[in-house]
Amino acid sequence: MIKVRRNRKDREVLAMKQVKMMSLNAREKDNALNEVRLLASIDAPNVISYKTAFFQETGNTLCILMEYADGGDLSGLIQKKKETKRRFSENFIWQVAFDILQGLRTLHDNKVIHRDIKPANIFFVGGVAKLGDLNVSKVMEGKYASTQTGTPYYTPPEIWNNQKYDGRVDVWSLGCVLYELAKLQPPFLARDFPGLSRKVTAGYY
């Protein structure tokens, strides 16, 4: 759950993400704490900035305060375009590509793979596109990772095939997002996961 809060000291508007820990399994709890660690370690213009985090014993809730995205997220913008039957301009698509590639460069330079690039995780602050939601991101300890994660429509072949992967999976996912901006639908569509997997691994769209 995301709420909007205002800092009492400087009146800055912030987003507060509330995670009810009691309702999570062990892996989900690790992901929530992982997001705090990663946000605190990254300071970049194209990554949503972290402010602080605290734990509310009442309700057993982890609260993460971060930069507020006044322009919402990309999934909301796509939905509006679908409703009005209008397209994004080419300049807008190029700007999103540039901004997010800058964010990915920062993450990858810090040996972090985002692993869940999708419209809902791309936010806009003052017109600038920024990466957010790092809860399934991973700090690379070696050359490759192998854990299956991500959102199916934007998941690259390596993960579908249970192969080892590196930061290039984020570039694949971004490519899927940019395709969706141009066509207003993801490049790979299917009725079920097996069908989606076959299309992605064959490169058939």
Regions found by a protein language model. Name each.
Residues 12-13, 18-42:
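Conserved N-lobe beta3->alphaC-helix segment of eukaryotic protein kinase catalytic domains
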Residues 49-59:
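Short beta-strand micro-motifs within the conserved protein kinase catalytic domain, predominantly
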Residues 59-73:
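Conserved short submotifs of the Hanks-type protein kinase catalytic core
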Residues 75-87:
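AlphaC helix of the protein kinase catalytic domain
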Residues 96-97:
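Activation segment signature within eukaryotic-like protein kinase domains
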Residues 108-124:
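Catalytic-loop of the protein kinase fold
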